Amino acid sequence: MNKSTLAIVVSIIASASVHAAEVYNKNGNKLDVYGKVKAMHYMSDYDSKDGDQSYVRFGFKGETQINDQLTGYGRWEAEFAGNKAESDSSQQKTRLAFAGLKLKDIGSFDYGRNLGALYDVEAWTDMFPEFGGDSSAQTDNFMTKRASGLATYRNTDFFGIVDGLDLTLQYQGKNEDRDVKKQNGDGFGTSVSYDFGGSDFAVSGAYTLSDRTREQNLQRRGTGDKAEAWATGVKYDANDIYIATFYSETRNMTPVSGGFANKTQNFEAVIQYQFDFGLRPSLGYVLSKGKDIEGVGSEDLVNYIDVGAIYYFNKNMSAFVDYKINQLDSDNTLGINDDDIVAIGLTYQF
């Protein structure tokens, strides 16, 4: 693979924000903006997942150098639906909004709407062209993905002592004034990852424990004062190959019809190969199995094979197709959609 193509692909995959356009950098103050336009269409027999799914994401990252040891920073990111009527008030949502301080070699501390500690593991397989990352990770579901009220401490290279050993400690304040499936009580989470001093192989683990709300315990399904989850993952990223997998379990946390699953067992895997002419085929699998669900017993909540590909024209423009081959039974007790979905589209990002 030639070096210029490799640099483009690595930067795209690592994070959308790495394309940020620097709008200000002077006297220790820096401001970058980033975003993407995803023009996308779903094809499915499931009506709510058939049709235009286009959206725009936009954000900024800023930092200020307070002194040679201390830096302040903030980040905001929002998404705007491109398939809604202009009069629809639901067309915009805030994905990230946090600010914090970073002390050299000690770590960073921030507060706001951020990514939960469990997602530090789950993110390794959330690499499909469109789908994926939805077995145990769900937005505003305790600390499994993006969530509100998160106080987060992150330390890289373990205080400068161990290269590649990263640590996260996180606290989440209660959020009760919302839909019951998006509520949470006070909770704590942690994650750790290690790449063996910069090797191509890495391992990770995470654990979260939260109080559940009174309203959650009144639901027909899923009882218990605590919501708990753990996850462990491995990945390999070298020689144009990306392979990652993780296993996780949740207790009284994952939403189902009528409440929550008392237990879930979750597995995800992805393998991708980067060709030097810009094509990146992808093969993945996602499974979430609910256990001990009242009136149901055991039931697959998510189960699909994912086949897709991305073609990078350059660092800013790409085309993709992603086929979600649903493996759920059509007569599943919880009434979960079992239809396949094909996503196709173009992405421009900066």
Swiss-Prot record:
Residues 1-20 form the signal peptide. One of its GO terms (biological process) is monoatomic ion transmembrane transport. It comes from the Bacteria. It is found in: Cell outer membrane. Its main location: membrane. Keywords: Cell outer membrane, Ion transport, Membrane, Porin, Signal, Stress response, Transmembrane, Transmembrane beta strand, Transport. One of its GO terms (molecular function) is porin activity. Induction: By phosphate starvation. The keyword Membrane applies. It is a multi-pass membrane protein. CDD domains: gram_neg_porins (cd00342). One of its GO terms (cellular component) is cell outer membrane. Pfam families: Porin_1 (PF00267). The keyword Membrane applies. Belongs to the Gram-negative porin family. Homotrimer. Uptake of inorganic phosphate, phosphorylated compounds, and some other negatively charged solutes. This is Outer membrane porin PhoE. The lineage of its organism: Bacteria, Pseudomonadati, Pseudomonadota, Gammaproteobacteria, Enterobacterales. The gene is phoE.
